[in-house]
Amino acid sequence: MSKTTQLSFPAADPFILRAVDGRYYLYCTSEDGSGIPIHVSDDLVHWQRCGTAIGKDTARWGVGCFWAPECYEINDKYYLFYSADWKENPTGALENFRIGVAVADDPAGPFADMADKPIFDPGYPIIDADVYTEDGRYYLYYSRCCYEHNVDGLEESWIYGVELKPDFTGVIGEPVLLLRPEQEWEGRSAAATGRRWNEGSYLLKHNRKYYMTYSGNFFAGPDYAVGYATADTPLGPYTKAPENPILERSAQVTGTGHNCMFRTTAGELMICYHGRTEATGNDRIAFISPAHFDEQGRLVIDAE
């Protein structure tokens, strides 16, 4: 694909898996948060709905806000990591999100929760799971929500990483803070919302460097945008790119963010993210654009 493709249906927080059958599966947040839709395509242009991965009718621990799924093929099984509102809420927290994992034999499901509780409880609400594996070890990246996380008078969302147990039943060690809002562009929503965000991380490796893409600003606002940071190890420390943001609003599309990256069957590097247009209104629509690394090792999005 040499140009940006806009999908024809709402697909917030999109994640695309290229499965062993050669087909592409898209998992996303539904606009009402009641479940995680699955779509399938042979060419990244024409898509068909093929099911719901998990939702309030099938989940064992979540009761709503089924958000930000990512699906991975591991040892002939499909593992879906996602965020949801945890039913265990003794304090009545307004944001009680945690991360869980469901498993299936097929990328189209049916998926079933592996446990009746989240993977772990850090003691604060978390969303936006991303999982990276290397040398037999698994790493979970997530976003601590802004909720009740006051930093110098503003609530902030931070990105953490932690090693996962190989059977996904918990974590190993303590989470490590990786990214927090620091660059000027990450505060464009602060005056209107009282919050600053770093969220929606995705990790990939290129030439022995780890590249973490992430989103900044309010997801429902026009200034939602994507930056990246690099590190020499999966758990950092990470240094943000000075050229951030690398994907932001244009005259046609606003609110561009919460991306994943993948390679096509031809080996092309692609980024999938959501955004809004005048025609789509408040619905978040998925876009797929080519991407590449330049001679200096900078990540470049070709979103024309």
Kindly give the residue locations of the regions a language model identified.
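Carbohydrate-active catalytic/glycan-binding domains of CAZyme proteins
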Residues: 1-304
